[in-house]
Amino acid sequence: MTSASASLERFAANKLAGLDRRNLRRRTRETRPLGGALVERDGRQLVNACSNDYLGLSQHPAVIEAAAAAARQFGAGSGASRLVTGGHPLLFELEARLAAFKGTEDCLVFGSGYLANLAITPALVGSGDIIFVDTLAHACLHAGARLSGARVEVFPHNDMAALEAMLKTLRPVHRHAMILTDGVFSMDGDLAPLPDMMALAQTHDAWTLIDDAHGIGVIGGGHGSTHAFQPSVVPPLQMGTLSKALGSYGGYVCASRDVCDLLRTRARPLVFTTALPPASIGAALAALDLIEQDSALRERPMDLARRFCRTLGLAEPNSPIVPIIIGDESAALSASAELEDAGFLVTAIRPPTVPRRTARLRITFNAAHSEADIDRLATTLKSILQTAEAAE
């Protein structure tokens, strides 16, 4: 079938050619989960070392059965926005459970973590307000900030002195202010300095939104990055996902009852999106049960990350995310291909996901990995890096 728009085809072809020249074209490849940390690609079995399924719960029998039971009881889909048809009982149960788990009055579940961050900020601030966002915060935090219509100022990564200077200068001339950051940064694995940030927010009357997508389940006893500090902190807006450590799908924000009520009316990605299917909610509830009950499960990804870093002589990790910075995009792709040849799935992460000249292997640790998997990954990667260095 021939496209009706030749100019569109030329545009796409030219853009793709440019991406190819810079080793930046993205491709998707069929990959079949085999259970645990194993996947199959092109007929070969690989150890998956790049998934965000940190606790392996997407493959846990209890989580799978809970998803199936919810679908049998409530159906395959939700049919409409919650504001049109209401929500099934499991959805309200999950929101109450998440609020209690995160130490807030209320919670609101969205269709995904990305949608949650597109929803929260534009519902709370706009023209005449100002947003301060960490330069390495997730793309959806930046997107939500831009959508709001507020002034957006980007501060250097985790630089509280720079943030303080910006707050002192700019906060007094704006009506409301927000500070946006990841709790655990998805590409670097480091944590935001939340106590210092919260102190600045208190001093300058700024509302702090923490994206804890990569914290819940594995950091701070499972409660997330807010509990990684002593004492723990309670930001007014705690966002997260159901799709990583919880092994399901969806996003949420935990906040006060009034703030959540306001979002129910003003958050467009909630108002105008069909609610999550029952299976996703049932799976998330079962996953939350396991996280609350099993401390060994929660701690295993960090234990494996530490083991890996010790073998390679790397610094102590802050999270189950360990980046190996390669720099050059072509070299990162080559290292990823060599790991795949050796039986490991570790995708090369390239711009614009990460800054230019910081292409990397983003290695993540899963409770389903064995110690033997991690030891072999470390020794294989060490050999690949040494060979590449010798060839320079």
Curated annotation (Swiss-Prot):
Residues that bind substrate: 26, 138, 353
Catalytic activity: 6-carboxyhexanoyl-[ACP] + L-alanine + H(+) = (8S)-8-amino-7-oxononanoate + holo-[ACP] + CO2
Pathway field: Cofactor biosynthesis; biotin biosynthesis
N6-(pyridoxal phosphate)lysine carried by residues: 244
Keyword Lyase: no
Pfam families, per database record: Aminotran_1_2
Binding positions (pyridoxal 5'-phosphate): 113-114, 186, 214, 241
Keyword Transferase: yes
Listed InterPro entries: Aminotrans_II_pyridoxalP_BS, Aminotransferase_I/II_large, AON_synthase_class-II, AONS_Archaea/Proteobacteria, AONS_Proteobacteria, PyrdxlP-dep_Trfase, PyrdxlP-dep_Trfase_major, PyrdxlP-dep_Trfase_small
UniProtKB keywords: Biotin biosynthesis, Pyridoxal phosphate, Transferase
Gene Ontology MF terms: 8-amino-7-oxononanoate synthase activity; pyridoxal phosphate binding
EC number: 2.3.1.47
Reported cofactor(s): pyridoxal 5'-phosphate
GO biological process: biotin biosynthetic process
NCBIfam families, per database record: bioF (TIGR00858)
Subunit structure: Homodimer.
Family statement drawn from the similarity comment of this UniProt entry: Belongs to the class-II pyridoxal-phosphate-dependent aminotransferase family. BioF subfamily.
Role description: Catalyzes the decarboxylative condensation of pimeloyl-[acyl-carrier protein] and L-alanine to produce 8-amino-7-oxononanoate (AON), [acyl-carrier protein], and carbon dioxide.
Protein name per its UniProtKB record: 8-amino-7-oxononanoate synthase
Provenance organism: Maricaulis maris (strain MCS10) (Caulobacter maris)
Name of the coding gene: bioF
